[in-house]
Amino acid sequence: MDINNEILKLDWKREPYGLYEPIEYTLAAGGKRVRPQLAMIASRMFDGKDEEVLPAALALEVFHNFTLLHDDVMDKADMRRGRPTVHVKWNENTAILSGDQMLIEAYKLLSGVPADKLPRVLQLFNQMATEICEGQQYDVDFESQEQVTIEEYLKMIRLKTS
């Protein structure tokens, strides 16, 4: 199963277009798709079925890209994956709203996880989300600090990448 094709199959042709076009633009930009690939590989290691892990794998990628939209706004980044960032191509409000919608869409995708696995998946997903937010806050905090230790920096990176 090609995770990139599965991501591109997600339907973003909805109204209001100003909310969903930036999501489609973001996900169509590609990327390594490391998180969903790792989810698929881990599942296969334990004889899991691709169709059972696919909703969680897709949710991971949508969530990851949501964090990138918000990170680009916070960092005032102009480019991402060789293309203008959403807040540059559209505007900051659109980037924030589209990012927020991606978060919601990630949870909607998780609803496709088999019922017996869903509580644990949600627990892990929420832990990941919390760690990413904590790491991002450290990143913001470090911008105003004179010095950051290597240990602090590594902690920030570990949390941001969860």
PLM region spans:
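Conserved N-terminal diphosphate/IPP-binding helix and adjacent helical/loop segment
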Residues: 1-63, 69, 73-88, 127, ...
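All-alpha helical catalytic cores of prenyl diphosphate-utilizing isoprenoid enzymes
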Residues: 13, 28-32, 97, 113-162
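Short alpha-helical transmembrane interface motifs in multi-pass membrane proteins
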Residues: 24, 91-92, 154
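Catalytic-loop motifs flanking and including active-site residues across diverse enzymes
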Residues: 34-35, 58, 95-102, 160-161
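Residue-level signal for inorganic ion chemistry
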Residues: 38, 106, 135
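Short glycine/serine- and small hydrophobic-enriched flexible loop segments
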Residues: 40-44, 107-112
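Short alpha-helical functional segments enriched in proximate histidine and acidic residues
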Residues: 65, 109, 131
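Multi-pass membrane catalytic core of lipid/isoprenoid biosynthesis enzymes
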Residues: 88-108
